[in-house]
């Protein structure tokens, strides 16, 4: 018997994922793709795209969704310039930042930029340097810039590239850091931007724990701290500032999500018709989805999914509170029908909802017309 798209026993995970993609070419997920996937874990559509290794922005373009909040070329160039400046001249700005924060001593100044090596050597050199730290060698660097790590998800290694690893001589292992070019606004920095940076570092933490495990460590959770070291641009200047954020919950959430990848793949396969593949936009849009208001922060397909939710009368289009309030009716269309027809009878929950809606309508009328 030949294996089908729903035959989850006869094939390895990579083979099943290749069938899922069809003619589409897989692309790296990266830390950003993995953390966004964890935020949309209940959406079969997004999990299908992520597991198959398809770039969500490209899929969104094919199904007619505009990418939201694209950065201007100036913002992108400015961000790249800041991140590049942090690694220039022996990373002296980063060293000064960590010394000012009490994380490094003045004499702790060994820096290795992995990106300066030939691509074929970067992964091995990253592991070698981490091994030096685990062995307590005095040659271990204090800053490793652009380390090459990986996490295993759904049977394949996903490359993870944190901006930096940092450790003093007294530290047992490195902490993971991320450099962001948006300004540190003294506590008023966009919460969404900070959350995104922290979650990406959480993926880096898991990748570093995987690396130390591969080097023989038996207690990676103790060795590798869950804290996120986020380097921001100081307001009104090109100098950096440092935020250190504990993120145990984020690390645990993403770890559980990665562990669930095989089960998520089985759910995706079960939702697909026989022979259907994700290189067909119609197949993508026919998959079960769960649109929430925060999808716009985490998924390029949010606009297309919102259109579907609106067409289906899903109350989520008026917000999470609206969905909870209208839950008894299950759709905004049914809620309007209950409101418009005083003689309509449904379940006890629907009747209670109808009474609340009519009371709200009366109050609104009185407020508007006196």
Where are these regions (language model features)?
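Metal-dependent nuclease catalytic cores that hydrolyze phosphodiester bonds in DNA/RNA
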Residues: 1-167
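Short cysteine clusters
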Residues: 43, 295-299, 305
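Mg2+/Mn2+-dependent nuclease catalytic core
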Residues: 141, 147-258
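Polybasic (Lys/Arg-rich)
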Residues: 246-298
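Acidic, Mg2+-coordinating catalytic module of metal-dependent nucleases/exonucleases
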Residues: 288, 292, 302-310
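Short cysteine/histidine-rich zinc-coordinating motifs and their immediately flanking basic loops
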Residues: 308-318
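C-terminal non-catalytic accessory extensions
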Residues: 316-370
């Amino acid at each position: 018997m030949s294996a089908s798209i729903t035959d989850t026993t006869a094939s390895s995970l990579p083979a099943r994922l290749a069938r899922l993609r069809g003619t589409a070419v897989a692309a790296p997920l990266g830390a950003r793709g993995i953390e966004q996937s964890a935020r949309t874990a209940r959406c079969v559509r997004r999990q299908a795209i992520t597991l198959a290794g398809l770039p969500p922005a490209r899929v969104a373009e094919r199904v007619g969704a505009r990418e939201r909040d694209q950065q201007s070329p100036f913002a992108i160039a400015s961000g790249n310039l800041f991140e590049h400046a942090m690694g220039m001249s022996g990373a002296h700005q980063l060293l000064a930042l960590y010394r000012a924060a009490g994380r490094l001593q003045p004499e702790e100044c060994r820096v290795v930029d992995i990106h300066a090596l030939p691509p074929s050597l970067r992964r091995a050199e990253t592991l070698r340097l981490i091994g030096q730290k685990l062995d307590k060698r005095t040659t271990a660097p204090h800053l490793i810039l652009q380390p090459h790590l990986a996490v295993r998800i759904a049977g394949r290694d996903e490359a993870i590239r944190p901006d930096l690893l940092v450790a003093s001589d007294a530290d047992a292992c490195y902490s993971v850091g991320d450099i962001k070019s948006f300004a540190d606004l003294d506590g008023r920095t966009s919460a969404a931007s900070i959350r995104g940076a922290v979650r990406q570092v959480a993926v880096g933490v898991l990748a570093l724990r995987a690396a130390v495990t591969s080097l023989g460590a038996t207690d990676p959770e103790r060795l590798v701290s869950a804290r996120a070291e986020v380097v921001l641009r100081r307001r009104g200047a090109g100098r950096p500032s440092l935020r250190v954020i504990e993120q145990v919950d984020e690390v645990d959430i993403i770890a559980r999500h990665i562990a669930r990848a095989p089960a998520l793949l089985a759910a995706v396969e079960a939702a697909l018709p026989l022979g259907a593949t994700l290189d067909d936009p119609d197949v993508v849009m026919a998959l079960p989805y769960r649109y929430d208001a925060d999808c716009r922060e985490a998924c390029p397909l949010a606009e297309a999914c919102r259109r579907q939710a609106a067409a289906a009368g899903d109350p989520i289009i008026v917000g999470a509170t609206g969905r909870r309030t209208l839950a008894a009716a299950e759709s905004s269309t049914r809620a309007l029908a209950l409101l418009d027809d005083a003689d309509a009878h449904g379940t006890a929950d629907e009747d209670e909802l109808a009474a609340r809606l009519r009371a709200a309508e009366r109050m609104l009328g009185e407020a508007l017309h006196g």
